[in-house]
Amino acid sequence: MRPKELIGSKSHEDHGLDSKVPLSFAEMIDLDSINDQDIKDLIIKERAIPVTISIDEGIRPKIIDSCGMTCSFCHNEGTPVASAYSKTTLLPNPRYRGGRVSIFEKTNNVNFIPGTMQPDDNFLDSLLQTKQALGIKEVHLTGGEPTLHPMLPQIVAMAARVDLDVKMTSNGENGKRQIAECASAGLSKINFSIFGTTPEELAMTQHERYQNPALAARKLDALHESINEALIHGLKVDANIVMSSLAHADRVARILDRYGEKVTIRIQNDLNNQRESRLAIYKFLAMVNAEPEELRIDAGTADAKVRYRMPTGEVIIFKQIRKTMLPETCGDCTLNNPTDCKEGYYGTRLYVDTNGKYKIGICLLRMDLTQDIDDFINSTLPGEILQHRERTKPTQTALP
């Protein structure tokens, strides 16, 4: 992301942003509807903090479909679980071998099986094409679980060689074996997804066949080993955790106690329980005496983050969704309503199918919009995305 500092007033007009879209959750919430004074006070403070605008210049390559987790809420980047299909299986026909799921597969009209990206000329060409068409400067590797890819360091190195900032989302499953070499190859940051902080918590998120605390304990050990390995090798580390209600406060506290200032905690609200989740996060932040410092918005996507700091120095990021839409593509979509589409346009994703064809997608709920990369580049979508980015970026870099 390319930051542009904006200090002072937070009006949409000053920032050159779409005035129909609230800057953050703090602007969406009616203070009169809140009875808790601690939450009210924190929201008022959040409304007054400085804003930093970053321009979305990233893409998310799904480099592998394999994963050793069986999370019941997994969207699998919009694609089917590859291991559930044979070459003769027609879509959609989920069989979920091994307990894995893809929660949108039955309804998103996906029409391909995900393959595995290789550090070859086809992968390099896809990066160069997206750089030219969309001005991409960052790749964020996803899966499945990226650390299960046997050639992950080579993929990182290839992206880094063409001047792309390389980041990754991981559950830490195989990180201890991969992270050192990835760091040497040019990886800059890992976002670790934390689905539970005790074996019992993690086990409850898995398919019923695998709700085994002993197995979950081994998964947690691997996660902690991966986080430590990333810190040893100088990588930036974020820990992502969803907080559905105040009952989950202990989970966040355990991560803070374990890693302190070494790791940035990113708390995400539950999209299926939005109001309770948001208020619970504000209450937790008030309970730990965290103070809001900065609102960061990624112009061109629905991503927004508020940085909080605790009195002891630890940073907590309240990750938020400020729902923005592509004007043409999203404008006439039947899912463009508060019930069906909770995120809006969240950026581009890069896929490869089992035939080795690279594709670009723009929506997990509308995988029918995913196109072969050449078709995408020759379509109107790159222009629409660039115009959307331009329309939502700031008109000035500093306020008087």
Named regions from a protein language model:
Residues 136, 163-164, 187, 232-236:
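A short helix->loop->beta-strand "cap" motif at the edges of active sites that frequently abuts
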Residues 27-37, 47-121, 134:
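Canonical Radical SAM [4Fe-4S] cluster-binding loop centered on the CxxxCxxC motif
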Residues 4-7, 11-16, 271-400:
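Accessory C-terminal segments flanking Radical SAM cores
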Residues 31-58, 304-327:
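Short, charged low-complexity linear segments at domain edges
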Residues 57-61, 139-141, 166-168, 190-192, ...:
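Hydrophobic faces of well-ordered beta-strands that scaffold small-molecule active sites
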Residues 75, 131-132, 153-161, 183, ...:
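Surface-exposed amphipathic alpha-helices with a cationic face
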